[in-house]
Design a protein with these regions (language model features):
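A cross-family phosphate/adenosyl-ligand binding-site feature
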Residues: 1-85, 91-151
Length: 151
């Protein structure tokens, strides 16, 4: 699922369109399709990751305001007690942001800001990105070959 705002961000920051990501996707859902499978608790999945997660999306999830498929799927993920990982990237954070993130954390949501780790001495943006992807995958219980653990 990619929101219209997500599509703009993808293009502005990466020069990519949603079609460019389809090689890694099985299904593409429209953000306005509230009747899609991820909107139902009976749809089996391991969990949900929102990357990047805007503070608007954080606010919507916190308040249960499910006006698009991402917000509804996150709401269902929380109610079904499945893993929800939000890769937030706002900086600096306001008190409102922190309150919303705290509230979600209290619900068991994993807040994972894409913080650069220097202990592995990254030499490229690709290595920094790989480390962040590794952290996300690790939280989902999945292995990522480019993730260097602390030794």
């Amino acid at each position: 699922m990619i929101t219209s705002a997500g599509e703009k961000t993808l293009w502005q920051e990466c020069g990519l369109r949603p079609e460019d990501l389809m090689q890694w996707a099985d299904i593409k859902y429209d953000e306005n399709d509230i009747g899609a499978a991820p909107a139902s608790g009976s749809w089996k999945n391991t969990g949900m990751i929102v990357v990047p997660c805007s503070m608007k999306t954080v606010a919507g999830i916190t308040s249960g305001y499910s006006d698009n498929l991402i917000l509804r799927a996150a709401d269902v993920t929380i109610k079904e007690k499945r893993k929800l990982i939000l890769v937030t990237r706002e900086c600096p954070l306001s008190t409102i942001h922190l309150r919303n993130l705290h509230e979600l954390s209290q619900m068991g949501v994993i807040i994972l800001p894409p913080v650069v780790s220097y202990y592995n001495h990254p030499e490229s943006i690709s290595e920094v990105t790989g480390h962040i992807v590794g952290k996300i995958m690790d939280c989902m219980g999945m292995e990522y070959q480019h993730f260097k653990r602390w030794e």
